């Protein structure tokens, strides 16, 4: 293996756009082919934000975040995309196999195979493309995923964003919904506020959150939108909540600071009473920010 092709944590945490080692999950990588990479990662068992869910399972959103980080690592280290470029997801789908995601009181080593395809190049670097993942725990397939992504130079990104402040600051002015019905143990992780309307909440953004905001950002991160979707799904699913082992998400535009973003959730009809499917959408200033369909077993009972 080419020594220059290996990035080992914690030296490479900037490669996954994290500033705190505890929030960076890949440990090393190796190229398997022109557009295929193997990434070794560790899922923590005691992460304060990505805590175990349901019957002591790794949070599917933790798995999705490990996928996202593995893709960023592959594009930076494997294709030479410079740090400082913007990594923009427009689609993100995943399927987790919960029987292989038990926590068991200790960190879990996983292997992620990253496949890149449909790459469009500009100035010798990928400008957009698709990425797929196969996540293994030992010899067991624990999850799969696919996404569509774009990359932007800092200059092009600022031109696209116009006069939006480089570093947005948002402190919540509304009370959070109760933590437990939203699928959270800590109130500081709740990202929804009540509106008095059934099935509709206001996105609650706190740029002081150590995991959701680790560096200056000019818009609400996609990770926070996915968390809002999960919490809304738990609230409409009822007291048992939901473990979102499957998700199909489309990001349509940025969610901006300083304007309310409304999160709506509706349970979808289904023949399987043991599985809950919820459609969640986010709207801001009359436009759709994102839409997602989450499916999974009830978290309790």
Curated annotation (Swiss-Prot):
> EC number(s) in its UniProt entry?
2.3.1.277
The reaction(s) catalysed by this protein are: a medium-chain 3-oxoacyl-[ACP] + dihydroxyacetone phosphate = a (4-alkanoyl-5-oxo-2,5-dihydrofuran-3-yl)methyl phosphate + holo-[ACP] + H2O
Does Transferase show up as a keyword for this record?
Answer: yes
The cross-references to Pfam families, in alphabetical order and at most eight, read: AfsA
Annotated GO molecular function terms are: transferase activity
Which terms are listed as keywords in the entry? Answer: Plasmid, Transferase
Q: Which InterPro entries match?
A: AfsA-like, AfsA_hotdog_dom, HotDog_dom_sf
Q: Which family does it belong to?
A: Belongs to the AfsA family.
- Which function does this protein serve? Involved in the biosynthesis of A factor (2-isocapryloyl-3R-hydroxymethyl-gamma-butyrolactone), a gamma-butyrolactone autoregulator that triggers secondary metabolism and morphogenesis in Streptomyces. Catalyzes beta-ketoacyl transfer from 8-methyl-3-oxononanoyl-acyl carrier protein (ACP) to the hydroxyl group of dihydroxyacetone phosphate (DHAP), thus producing an 8-methyl-3-oxononanoyl-DHAP ester.
Give the protein's recorded name.
2-oxo-3-(phosphooxy)propyl 3-oxoalkanoate synthase
């Amino acid at each position: 293996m080419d020594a220059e092709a290996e990035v080992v944590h914690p030296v490479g945490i900037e490669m996954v756009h994290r500033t705190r080692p505890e929030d960076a999950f890949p440990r090393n990588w190796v190229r398997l082919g022109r557009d295929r990479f193997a990434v070794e990662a560790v899922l923590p068992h005691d992460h304060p934000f990505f805590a175990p869910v349901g019957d002591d399972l790794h949070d599917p959103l933790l798995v999705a975040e490990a996928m996202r980080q593995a893709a960023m690592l592959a594009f930076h280290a494997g294709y030479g995309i410079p740090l400082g470029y913007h990594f923009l997801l427009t689609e993100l789908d995943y399927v987790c196999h919960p029987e292989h995601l038990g926590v068991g009181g200790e960190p879990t080593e996983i292997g992620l195979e990253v496949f890149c395809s449909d790459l469009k190049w500009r100035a010798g670097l990928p400008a957009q493309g698709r990425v797929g993942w196969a996540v293994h725990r030992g010899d067991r397939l624990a999850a799969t995923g696919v996404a569509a992504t774009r990359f932007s130079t800092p200059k092009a990104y600022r031109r696209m964003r116009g006069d939006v402040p480089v570093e947005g600051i948002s402190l919540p002015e509304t009370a959070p919904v109760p933590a437990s019905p939203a699928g959270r143990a800590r109130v500081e992780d709740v990202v929804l506020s009540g509106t008095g309307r059934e099935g509709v909440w206001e996105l609650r953004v706190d740029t002081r959150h150590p995991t959701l905001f680790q560096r200056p950002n000019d818009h609400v991160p996609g990770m926070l939108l996915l968390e809002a979707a999960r919490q809304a799904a738990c609230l409409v699913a009822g007291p048992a909540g939901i473990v979102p082992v499957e998700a199909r998400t489309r990001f349509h535009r940025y969610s901006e600071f300083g304007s309310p973003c409304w999160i709506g959730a509706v349970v979808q009809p289904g023949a399987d009473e043991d599985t809950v499917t919820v459609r969640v959408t986010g709207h801001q200033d009359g436009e759709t920010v994102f839409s997602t369909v989450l499916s999974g077993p009830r978290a309790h009972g």
